[in-house]
């Protein structure tokens, strides 16, 4: 990067939050945003040394390879834990556009409504379930369609598993026979029992915050208001 860069806002880290923040600040075309990311672009490029790492980001079955790839992962470790005999543990964090949303398992799982209400009771105003639900809905493009808990038209695509493996289906059926109820929506009003995960994927590929929110993915005039380094 050479020369002087002028920006109204500087965001350090183009991860799960950074991409969203850059997109929101640039929506009206009023502000120029500088988005800084220590890792590189998440998309495959002509750079062969980086091509495979970036390709695996977007292929769902390839996510496990990113968990040990220093090109897209900071490979942090925890402090020695007495509870596990003094061992340290790998703590994956994304080092790429999209951050950890570019290397996670793509599972779309909301917290229990009671947990959010508990935070509000402890004094966290604005964090009750009824306060956060509109933002869950605003962010979401639920392929099943909209309802009280879900919405369509948002940047984060949420889909059902494309390949219903028979062993997984047999496990859910076994749970049902054992008295563990089967339910239809992992993020529905009742979250006790066994069901299929939903995933942040679109057309069989990962939908990270870089894919969903980063303005450089957009053809709108606002995309020119965000500079990514």
Identify the role of each PLM range.
Residues 1-229:
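N-terminal redox-cofactor-binding region of secreted/periplasmic oxidoreductases
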